[in-house]
Structure formats: structure tokens, C-alpha cells
């Protein structure tokens, strides 16, 4: 398949690498040239400007936030330059409002749009073990399945309205952040009673909370290791704000999301923004006087 790819951050570069490894023709663009050079060495073609990648059958993008998506796709003319009939798979965690806006913008230009946010960190992406939540035209999703099957281990369709996939992703990330926060507070409580964090978390993640997220982040909290960051606290704040905006639009109270937002803001204000978002546990320990 002829694929354009925009966004070569931690996730994007490994996903693009998998597509190249699967034999697809991939043309890449990224603001930072170093990531482009890395992919060219693996067989990708470098695009001089973002609009050049839109002359393809499929376009895959994974950018940091709504502003980056609008800047590249609208301001830099990617949508207007796209080949008619192109199908765009947007893997990014963007707002529900932007998903609605972009679905309409693609329809207006006779382009397909699939909201396809992913669950998983860069190591899972490198192994093709992401879970992909997809929403959009069923025919477009079927056509894109050869790409989706390279990127992830399972595709979860959630209907034809693009914004639904992003609502699922945002809600899921809220749940992960909530799990990290509760583990951090529980560890602070048990540490205050003389219990080793690793011992406590080993019990809980082997019994009541044996899910992968608890094991992964529990291990990070026990080891107090928040670098390298698979997902930063700054990105965590971005996603909690997306959850609150989506909730506000439908009058859904989310009091714990508001508390998480404030905690992430405090972390960032005190220099922890580029640490893994599991560093929420550090804030809980600090407030308990356990520095």
C-alpha cells in the first residue's frame, strides 16, 4: 500500500517502522528531521512538506494535540492537497469536538476519515500489540484493515461517528490516570505505616488488581523510576483536560477528573512535566511528608 505518515514522535516512529517492515511504501514527514532520517534509513521516503504525504491511498497521523493537528492539516494544506478518495487514519488522542470537525472536513473534500486512537505505550507499538479503537465509515475501516493489523493486535470498532472512538480513548486514559493516583495515595498510606511500597504493590497487583496497567505503573511506582517516560505528565494533563471538556459539553460531572487536573498542574509547575505520568505517586508521597 502507498501510505503517507505524519508525526514521528515516540509512538509514530515505531508505528511507521512497522509499516515499512511489513512492505508498505511509506512517505514520512515530521517537524524534526532526525526522526525522518531514522525512517529513511529503514526504507521510507522523506517528504519535503506535509502536504506531499497526502498524495497517497492512505494517510496515517499521530500528532500531540488538537493545535498540532489543525496546524498541519488545515494551515499547512494537507487536506486540500489530498488525493480524492484518500483514507486518513488519525491515531492521535484528540478532543471529541475536533473528531467531529475533522470528520465533516474530510467528507467535504471526498476523503475518508477514521478516528483510530490507540491504547498502549511505545514498547507495545514496537511489537504490534496496540489496541486500536476505530470509528468511521465501515467500508473505509475494512479497506484500512491491512494497516490496522500491522499496527495493533486488535481493532475495536465503536460505530460510524468518529468522535465516539475519541470519547472511548479519553475515558480510558482518565481511568488509567485514576488508577495511578489511587495507587500513589495507597502507597503513601501504607508507607506511613512502615510497609515497603514494593511489598504492598506486589500483593495488590497479584490479587485484586492484576490488570496490565496496575502491574506496569505499580512497578514504576515501587521502583520510583519515572524516566524514560512512555507517556509524560504533560500529556496526562492534556488528556484530562480533554475529558473535562467532553464532559462539560454533555453536562457530565467528573469531580475526580478535576482533582487529577489540579494534581497534574502541580506536578508540571514543580518541574515534573516530562516525567512519566506515574510520577503522580511522587506528589502523593510529598503531600504525606514522605519525600
Predicted segments with their positions:
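Hydrophobic beta-strand scaffold residues
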Residues: 26, 46, 112-114, 155, ...
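Rossmann-fold NAD(P) dinucleotide-binding segment
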Residues: 50-111
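NAD(P)+-binding Rossmann beta1-loop-alpha1 motif at the extreme N-terminus of oxidoreductases
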Residues: 1-62, 81, 86, 122, ...
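Hydrophobic residues within alpha-helices
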Residues: 15-16, 35, 102, 147, ...
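Rossmann-fold dinucleotide-binding core
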Residues: 74, 92-174
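Helical "substrate-binding/catalytic lid" subdomain
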Residues: 162-288
Amino acid at each position: 500500500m502507498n501510505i503517507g505518515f505524519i508525526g514521528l514522535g515516540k509512538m509514530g516512529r515505531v508505528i511507521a517502522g512497522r509499516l515499512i517492515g511489513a512492505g508498505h511504501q511509506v512517505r514520512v514527514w515530521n517537524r524534526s528531521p532526525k526522526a525522518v532520517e531514522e525512517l529513511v534509513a529503514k526504507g521510507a521516503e522523506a517528504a519535503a512538506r506535509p502536504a506531499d504525504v497526502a498524495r497517497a491511498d492512505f494517510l496515517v497521523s499521530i500528532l500531540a494535540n488538537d493545535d498540532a493537528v489543525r496546524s498541519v492539516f488545515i494551515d499547512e494544506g494537507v487536506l486540500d492537497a489530498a488525493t480524492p478518495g484518500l483514507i486518513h487514519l488519525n491515531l492521535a488522542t484528540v478532543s471529541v469536538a475536533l473528531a467531529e470537525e475533522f470528520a465533516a472536513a474530510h467528507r467535504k473534500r471526498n476523503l475518508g476519515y477514521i478516528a483510530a486512537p490507540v491504547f498502549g505505550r511505545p514498547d507495545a507499538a514496537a511489537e504490534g500489540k496496540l489496541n486500536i479503537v476505530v470509528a468511521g465509515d465501515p467500508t473505509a475501516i475494512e479497506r484500512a484493515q491491512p494497516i490496522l493489523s500491522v499496527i495493533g493486535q486488535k481493532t475495536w470498532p465503536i460505530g460510524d461517528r468518529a468522535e465516539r472512538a475519541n470519547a472511548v480513548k479519553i475515558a480510558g486514559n482518565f481511568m488509567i490516570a485514576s488508577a495511578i493516583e489511587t495507587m500513589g495515595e495507597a502507597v503513601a498510606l501504607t508507607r506511613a505505616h512502615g510497609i515497603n511500597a514494593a511489598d504492598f504493590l506486589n500483593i495488590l497487583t497479584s490479587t485484586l488488581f492484576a490488570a496490565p496497567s496496575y502491574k506496569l505503573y505499580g512497578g514504576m511506582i515501587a521502583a520510583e523510576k519515572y524516566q524514560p517516560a512512555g507517556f509524560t505528565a504533560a500529556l496526562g494533563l492534556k488528556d484530562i483536560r480533554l475529558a473535562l471538556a467532553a464532559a462539560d459539553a454533555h453536562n457530565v460531572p467528573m469531580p475526580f477528573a478535576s482533582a487529577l487536573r489540579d494534581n497534574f498542574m502541580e506536578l508540571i509547575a514543580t518541574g515534573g512535566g516530562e516525567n512519566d505520568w506515574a510520577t503522580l505517586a511522587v506528589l502523593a508521597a510529598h503531600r504525606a511528608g514522605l519525600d
